[in-house]
Amino acid sequence: MFQRLNKMFVGEVTTSSSHEPEFSEKEDDEWILVDFIDTCTGFSAEEEEEDEDIGEESSAEHTSVFSCLPTSLECLADTSDSCFLQFESCPMEESWFITPPPCFTAGGLTTIKVETSPMENLLIEHPSMSVYAVHNSCPGLSEASCGNDDYNSSGPRMEAQSELGTHIHCCVAALAAQATFLEQPKSFRPSQWIKGHSERQSLNRNGLRRQNLTRDCHTRQMKHRCWAVHQPCPRQYNY
């Protein structure tokens, strides 16, 4: 194994040393043109010559290109239409089958038939999305079909009306609750507040003490007025 690797490396060195290196530059336009049709025709011409010499056994070894392709591309093998491209048999061992798009084949004059997947036209739609609803307005339809269409079209309308009714009911309930909350301070009178405040204050210890003191002071003043003569106070300034 190592000897083979040595020979490979030594052989490359000798060949590179015997020939002078040639540098060539190619302008690349970011596109690579693959002449696959010419290569296939070249391979087919060689196979025809070999078939004349060898026979039918060699022709059985080279299978058609379309035998190894999936079922979606089997329509390419139909040679009945002359306007489509036709690929002849060529060996597919360790190679890729390149099919350029139609706009790059012969200036867009020829096209390649490719089967479209049914999932491409699939539209996943939510039931609440009524934007894509198709209303059939053909006059030639029967009355029964028109009645069914009217019933089906009125279904979303009824649902929308019921949703609108529930929304309005919720708004009315919220407004009523807010109105009752705002009317509570208006109905609250100051007399009720004074009465409740006095009741709460009467139960307090300090409040009871103040009431007792006011009563005592009032009784003492009444007794003093009964037996004592009230004299006016002296004037501070003489006018």
UniProtKB/Swiss-Prot annotation:
Top-level taxonomic group: Eukaryota
Q: Which GO terms describe its biological process?
A: apoptotic process; autophagic cell death; autophagosome assembly; cellular response to ethanol; cellular response to hydroperoxide; cellular response to methyl methanesulfonate; cellular response to UV; negative regulation of cell migration
Cellular compartments per GO CC? autophagosome; cytoplasmic vesicle; cytosol; nucleus; PML body
**Where does this protein come from, organism-wise?**
Rattus norvegicus
Name of encoding gene: Trp53inp1
According to UniProt, the name of this protein is Tumor protein p53-inducible nuclear protein 1
Protein function: Antiproliferative and proapoptotic protein involved in cell stress response which acts as a dual regulator of transcription and autophagy. Acts as a positive regulator of autophagy. In response to cellular stress or activation of autophagy, relocates to autophagosomes where it interacts with autophagosome-associated proteins GABARAP, GABARAPL1/L2, MAP1LC3A/B/C and regulates autophagy. Acts as an antioxidant and plays a major role in p53/TP53-driven oxidative stress response.
Q: Name one GO molecular function term.
A: antioxidant activity
Primary localisation category: cytoplasm
Q: Where is this motif: LIR?
A: 25-37
Record keywords, A-Z:
Activator, Antioxidant, Apoptosis, Autophagy, Cytoplasm, Cytoplasmic vesicle, Nucleus, Transcription, Transcription regulation, Tumor suppressor
Instruction: State the conditions that upregulate or repress this gene.
Output: In chronic pancreatitis tissue, expression is suppressed by camostat mesilate, a serine protease inhibitor, and by Saiko-keishi-to, a herbal medicine.
